[in-house]
């Protein structure tokens, strides 16, 4: 069996400081953007020349917070309620033989200043400090497959959930709204 070694090309800066705060997919939190800071020797403007012409990027990264836990042949995907087991290769679980993840994110801009190259990213699903091993432009003609099927994740999850409040809680929320003059819910 072959072994491979990869260099870290950058690090993610995001509002999510721990893995339990991270959305399950990019795009779920509108204001959850971040940055990708390239590290030496990859922090050169030439390395990103032409990238500004793409709206979205694939970010390949390391699941650094779960890699020491090792891999598992079966996992319980959250989309199945955490009750049914699936083979790890049929999921996007972090507990993989090679702890490599990929995320499709919007590229909002590129800043090159002195020895820094920073990619400004839209909504993402990565914890702050995530090591990045590669970036690739998203190619809509090749990667958007309208006839593809996806087993248990064929449709996007519901955007919201109904929440019911007790009359006492509703009264407390109304008091807060009046006091602060803005909607609480």
Labelled PLM ranges:
Residues 114-124:
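Short, solvent-exposed secondary-structure boundary/capping segments
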Residues 14, 106-109, 123:
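A residue-level detector for short acidic-glycine micro-motifs
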Residues 2-8, 95-105:
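Short coil-to-beta-strand transition motifs
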Residues 13, 19-20, 24-80:
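Active-site acidic/histidine clusters and adjacent loop/turn architecture
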Residues 72-95, 101-103:
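Short acidic (Asp/Glu) patches
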Residues 17, 110-116:
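Short, conserved beta-turn/loop elements at beta-strand boundaries and strand-helix junctions
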Residues 184-185:
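Conserved small/polar residues in nucleotide/adenosyl-binding loops
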Residues 122-153:
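Flexible glycine-rich active-site/ligand-binding loops centered on an Asp-His dyad
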């Amino acid at each position: 069996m072959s072994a491979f070694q990869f260099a870290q090309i950058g690090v993610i800066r995001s509002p999510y400081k721990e893995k339990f705060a991270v959305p399950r997919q990019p795009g779920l939190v509108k204001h959850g953007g971040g940055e990708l800071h390239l590290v030496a020797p990859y922090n050169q403007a030439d390395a990103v020349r032409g990238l500004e012409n793409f709206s979205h990027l694939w970010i390949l990264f390391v699941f650094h917070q779960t890699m020491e836990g090792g891999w598992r042949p079966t996992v319980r995907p959250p989309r199945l309620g955490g009750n049914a087991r699936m083979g790890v290769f049929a999921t996007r679980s972090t507990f993989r033989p090679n702890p490599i993840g990929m995320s499709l994110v919007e590229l909002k801009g590129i800043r090159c200043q002195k020895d820094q190259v920073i990619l400004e990213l839209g909504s993402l699903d990565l914890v702050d400090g995530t090591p990045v091993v590669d970036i690739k432009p998203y190619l809509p003609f090749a990667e958007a497959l309208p006839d593809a099927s996806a087993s248990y994740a064929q449709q996007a999850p519901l955007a919201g959930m109904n929440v019911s409040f007790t009359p006492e809680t509703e009264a407390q929320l109304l008091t807060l709204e009046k006091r602060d003059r803005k909607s609480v819910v």
